[in-house]
Amino acid sequence: MVKIENAHEGVIHHAALNYYGTRLATCSSDKTVKIFEINDVNNSSSLLETLVGHEGPVWYADWCHPSLGENLLATCGYDGKVLIWKESGHGGKMQIIGKHAVHSASVNCVKWAPHEYGLILLCGSADGKISVVELKDGQIASTKILDNAHKFGVNSISWAPLMKTDSSDDGDETTAVKQFISGGNDNLVKIWKFDDDQETYVVADTLEGHKDAVTAVDWSPTTLLQSYVASVSNDKQCLVWTQDHSSKKNDWKKISVNEGKFEQKLGSVSWSLSGNLLAVSDDDKNVTIWKESGDGKWEEVVN
């Protein structure tokens, strides 16, 4: 385990490892992002540089898949901006190559799409809108704005893994479908799909079950028999939503993890890379790990 000392002058809101686990980006209220190099051989870390560009607290960071750009990073913050950073040469400093400033309020979350789709960045804002930014040749090429995504603001977003569906009557042809999930202060979880006819993302399903603001959502990386989506909320609930791929109804079913017995508001949820474990954290700094049992219930495996 690598221990990293806090090098910020303010609260750390988020930390993100790159694909290889060799770089860590930390976001803080001190308006900066710090980049650490991680060496798991000798369990050490070193501060590489401090990124300055935001004019307020920085909430979130996300590294792009290395196949689309080595050490390409997106950050967002209270200033309503999304900054895209790229390392200038091998071992060089991170430089801003893109600035996305279309939102009228804090940008709370950013997520790169699965690398198979190319350089596409998803952004959720407190202004209630979601924007989808596409980059080509290192430049912002197009932006789609999804108005009124969530009343009172968007708190969390997550892409679905690459999934293909039959695009012909005989089932011989398949098409990749871009999908993502969002959660907001309207207590709702929404499933979005790209509509080829409208050339934008539309709401495919609205999932109701929370009684307070949805603080975090995550789409499981597994693409087998079912899709799994997890959401947590200020209502102290963690809900797991499942969709059976073999069913023609495509309905989403929900089950409450821990039967709604969490004692604190929940602020974060994350699937393991294999999709079989679910991590949930609360406002009292507790983290629990859950796994689905044979009867479909969720059992705690680590506290």
From Swiss-Prot:
**Taxon lineage:** Eukaryota, Fungi, Dikarya, Ascomycota, Saccharomycotina
Q: Where in the cell is it found?
A: Cytoplasmic vesicle, COPII-coated vesicle membrane; Endoplasmic reticulum membrane; Nucleus, Nuclear pore complex
User: Function, please?
Assistant: Component of the coat protein complex II (COPII) which promotes the formation of transport vesicles from the endoplasmic reticulum (ER). The coat has two main functions, the physical deformation of the endoplasmic reticulum membrane into vesicles and the selection of cargo molecules. It also functions as a component of the nuclear pore complex (NPC). NPC components, collectively referred to as nucleoporins (NUPs), can play the role of both NPC structural components and of docking or interaction partners for transiently associated nuclear transport factors.
How does this polypeptide assemble, per the annotation? The COPII coat is composed of at least 5 proteins: the SEC23/24 complex, the SEC13/31 complex, and the protein SAR1. Component of the nuclear pore complex (NPC). NPC constitutes the exclusive means of nucleocytoplasmic transport. NPCs allow the passive diffusion of ions and small molecules and the active, nuclear transport receptor-mediated bidirectional transport of macromolecules such as proteins, RNAs, ribonucleoparticles (RNPs), and ribosomal subunits across the nuclear envelope. Due to its 8-fold rotational symmetry, all subunits are present with 8 copies or multiples thereof.
Question: What's the encoding gene here?
Answer: SEC132
Indicate what this protein is called per its UniProt record: Protein transport protein SEC13-2
WD repeat spans: 7-46, 53-95, 102-143, 149-202, 209-251, 261-300
Regarding the membrane, this protein is recorded as:
Peripheral membrane protein
| Pfam families reported in the protein's UniProt record | WD40 (PF00400)
